[in-house]
Amino acid sequence: VLGLARAMARELGPDNVRVNCITPGLIQTDITAGKLTDEMTANILAGIPMNRLGDAVDIARAALFLGSDLASYSTGITLDVNGGMLIH
């Protein structure tokens, strides 16, 4: 999907069409509710610099940003929304 998005960004850029990706970290949703024990949650949070799980609003805000004029010169990018979980 990421490669396809980059290819589309390159192809559609001349037409002023922006194509970007959002890669979410662990997000609290109805699907994840009740699945993580306290110990599992503590272990996960230990690896997230922001010390919390994400929620749907975090992803929605990223999408709003990418769709706004604030990101008017951004195309072909991957925006990690994971609280810093994948900092290398």
Please tell me what each predicted stretch does:
Residues 1-11:
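Conserved catalytic helix of short-chain dehydrogenase/reductases
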Residues 5, 60-63, 67:
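Short-chain dehydrogenase/reductase
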Residues 10, 20-34:
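Short, flexible catalytic-loop segment of classical short-chain dehydrogenase/reductase
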Residues 10-14, 72:
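Alpha-helical segment proximal to the catalytic Tyr-Lys
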Residues 14-17, 77:
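Active-site loop of short-chain dehydrogenase/reductase
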Residues 34-48:
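A short C-terminal helix-loop "cap" of Rossmann-like NAD(P)-dependent dehydrogenase/epimerase domains
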Residues 48-59, 70:
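A conserved structural motif in NAD(P)-dependent oxidoreductases
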Residues 64, 75-88:
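Short C-terminal tail/terminal secondary-structure segment
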